[in-house]
């Protein structure tokens, strides 16, 4: 296929899609040019079905530093592992694409997005999402798209699609929404305490823009799309399924209704093991043994899935016996750890998170060096999910995509209420340790984070709480669930996380397993989430009503002083020599910004005071009219040089030593002698003139002698 180009304008910027020129050996490939951003997307599919029990989809978002005209930082001058932003963008693209493949599809699919040119005013992630959908849609890969995504900002009461950098910085909303022509299927958002009504309107505005992009894609698919390949779907034998359901469904139904998680898992596992053992014995010698046993396992999963959903939709009974809008039992505690800067323990049913606060000087902020201009990140929220939290063994090591994503969600939720740098000049790190999990652990980490911040004396604007909403839908009827647990998340159709204050929403995240949900469901879920959020906030405020007025004794104290910008180099010294000496002598940490704000940190107030004194003396300036107790350091014929303080000297001219005539300076002063002087002049070059005689009264002029008077008459 020769190169074909498709052009439109979207959100005020040119949008160009090129097909047929590059990456032609992939199943599908596109080059999307949006503004000055350019993204290459290639989609490929394995020829055979994988043997795993899940759909192996991999979506990558690769940031090439050359795209922004930047040289890679660090000693390795080559792109390495994906940045946090790249990982989050890959997840953002994966989530709306994944539900668009058929049930039982098991061929491995990879979608690789490479940013070739980066324009900070034209969203490369949204270009990559469009490219991913198009590459799959025009390929022979069985994909039930297209989908599209947009960013939505809210500036001065107006919604803006795919805002530029300045609009993003002015916005009260940072929303990414994706979906199909008919419905929304992915949401990711941070917001400055916006009400539910505005959030819902933003979603609808975003979906309307999505429909434009889908219409554009449909034109391209009609022109260059390939015929979809016939692939084998994972399907179980109907007769085997009927037999197992008839024989064992009643036992499995009973096991599923056990309310306590561990007991329920044990009961369902016992039924499954009995079924597997029976069929293992029956088909041990059968040549189709592996396929049959795979089917048995899949059938049991489907039976559990169907029973959990039936109980909720028909009987309105949840696995643990709760009402559909009921939260699990709550508990909150502060000061769980003695030596840290703040800690909070939050428990919701069998989900528990410990959040630990650490405060540090601004010099410890994380430097982010990606495609955007380098910047410093003041607030970090890290989320850890050890396998023991679910009673299992597993991999331990670097944070995976899920942990990075959950940490970022908590970061967005809590960042909206943090004090400004001027109010609270600290770098802030929260670490959420999930100690126990049965669903909604990311939202528990937000609640625990609020407790830790308030216990640590961080003056947040308001407490934040989070809740996860679920959905069970059969296409006609649906049930929205409050505070979903693990089983409801696994077998349900939606995981909709909502975090916020009493004032409004600070973060949203929605993933669904069906092709989309309606505005009515979104509105109902947001209303139900608000009620639950307020209930959790009641508990948080009962535990700690407001942030403590003081920091923990172990937290670094801070003091700030302002110096003239031209004195910064004096405090730092040649090669940092002076500031390093101050730090070594006092044990403090010191940060100096470009405007001359000096921040001094230490857990020892005396050390801070000593450092302040040293810095104050370094930047001290002599002022006209001030009096100093000085030391003579040099004598010349025309006067004496005296040291006022530190490295600041002044000249006492011979005429300023005394009111009477001084013949020789050395007759009156000697080196090392201490004298009081008054500054009488500072010129534009900083040279200082001082006077000794200005500190003593001028003697009266002598009266003329009578003799002289008489002599004049002679």
From Swiss-Prot:
All residue ranges annotated as the S1 motif domain in the record: 625-693
Residue ranges, annotated region (Disordered): 691-714
BP-aspect Gene Ontology terms: mRNA catabolic process; RNA processing
Binding site for Mg(2+): 489, 495
GO CC annotations, alphabetized: cytosol
EC nos: 2.7.7.8
Matches recorded under Gene3D superfamilies: GHMP Kinase, N-terminal domain, K Homology domain, type 1, Nucleic acid-binding proteins
Function per UniProt: Involved in mRNA degradation. Catalyzes the phosphorolysis of single-stranded polyribonucleotides processively in the 3'- to 5'-direction.
PANTHER family documented for this protein: POLYRIBONUCLEOTIDE NUCLEOTIDYLTRANSFERASE, POLYRIBONUCLEOTIDE NUCLEOTIDYLTRANSFERASE 1, MITOCHONDRIAL
Family annotation (HAMAP family): PNPase
Similarity comment: Belongs to the polyribonucleotide nucleotidyltransferase family.
Name of the molecule in the record: Polyribonucleotide nucleotidyltransferase
Species for this entry: Streptococcus equi subsp. zooepidemicus (strain MGCS10565)
UniProt gene name: pnp
